[in-house]
Amino acid sequence: MRIWWLLLVMGACTRSVFSQDTCRQGHSGIPGNPGHNGLPGRDGRDGAKGDKGDAGEPGHPGGPGKDGIRGEKGEPGADGRVEAKGIKGDPGSRGSPGKHGPKGSIGPTGEQGLPGETGPQGQKGDKGEVGPTGPEGLMGSTGPLGPKGLPGPMGPIGKPGPRGEAGPMGPQGEPGVRGMRGWKGDRGEKGKVGEAPLVPKSAFTVGLTVISKFPPPDAPIKFDKILYNELNHYNVATGKFTCHVAGVYYFTYHITVFSRNVQVSLVKNGVKVLHTKDSYMSSEDQASGGIVQELKLGDEVWMQVTGGERFNGLFADEDDDTTFTGFLLFSSS
């Protein structure tokens, strides 16, 4: 503030010198009293950011923080150095009793102490080792006679004595018990092969051909296609089967129907024993029949169309057959 007052005084003197043309410069006046404080000036604009200040002094250590979360187990560290032995610590609290150590060596016999109080009876100890055999004792006196013992085991058989004289013949004994069955004897030699039995035979199978199809009615059908007739029991010329072996026979027929209706019968000695009828529709058809009959020697069996030519539609060609079969089941002789 003093600097401001000094500048004001010097300014006033300068103005008075320039205003007086003839005035001389006098001696400096006495400095005036300080003026009153002026009004505070307005805030200046923010200056540019200053340089970074020097680092402050380290603060005082803070208080201990809260315990953090337990971290994962770290890897084992390297073996530390063996430091010098530290100062002996205070005695720790008494630990739990340890296991029994090995038996120590027997110490010297101490002085006999005062008799202690009788303790509780201890547990039974382990069986001790057998001690050495003691010296033989003196022979005792003979004891009293004991009771009679049990009979001993039978001794060995003695040598046979001399043969005695023959005694008188005794009475005849009863018959003995029947003995056990003997062992099975060896198998005998194989016998000679016997003669084969004569089995009676009789069989045939015959059929129609293109020539013999549509046979005439009311007469034995002459089957001229021989499939089997080794014994010639079926006569192709007559169309009849003649019995040469008395017995039971089976007869069967299979017919193809074409262009006309069919009505056939199986005849035995002139008697019709089986009938088959089939009506022709528009294509080939099949029909069949079978029967078992007992025959005597000389009996005759055949097939024939019944009902006229309207019912003789028995057909045969390269692809279709009409057959008649008979054979012996078993003989009655």
UniProtKB/Swiss-Prot annotation:
Organism: Mus musculus
Function field: Probable adipokine. Activates AMPK, AKT, and p44/42 MAPK signaling pathways.
Post-translational modification: The isomeric forms of the hydroxylated amino acids could not be determined in the mass-spectrometric methods reported in PubMed:18787108 but are assumed on the basis of their occurrence in collagen-like domains.
Key words, A-Z: Collagen, Glycoprotein, Hormone, Hydroxylation, Repeat, Secreted, Signal
Record's protein name: Complement C1q and tumor necrosis factor-related protein 9
Further comment found in the protein's record: Overexpression of CTRP9 in obese (ob/ob) mice significantly lowered serum glucose levels.
Gene symbol of the encoding locus: C1qtnf9
Gene3D superfamilies, per database record: 2.60.120.40
A Gene Ontology term for the protein's cellular component: extracellular space
Subunit structure: Multimers (predominantly trimers). Interacts with ADIPOQ via the C1q domain to form a heterotrimeric complex.
Organism taxonomic ancestry: Eukaryota, Metazoa, Chordata, Craniata, Vertebrata
4-hydroxyproline PTM sites in chain numbering: P31, P34, P40, P58, P61, P64, P76, P115, P151, P160, P175
Residue numbers spanned by region Disordered: 22-194
UniProt modified residues of type 5-hydroxylysine: K73, K127
Subcellular location: Secreted
Any GO MF annotation of the entry: identical protein binding
UniProt feature, compositional bias: Basic and acidic residues: 42-57, 67-88, 183-193
GO biological process terms held by the UniProt record: energy homeostasis; fatty acid oxidation; negative regulation of cell size; positive regulation of cellular response to insulin stimulus
Domain C1q: 197-333
Glycosylation sites: K73, K127
Ranges of residues in domain Collagen-like: 24-82, 84-130, 134-193
InterPro entries per record: C1q_dom, Collagen, Collagen/C1q_domain, Tumour_necrosis_fac-like_dom
Tissue: Expressed predominantly in adipose tissue. Females express higher levels than males.
Record's signal peptide: 1-19
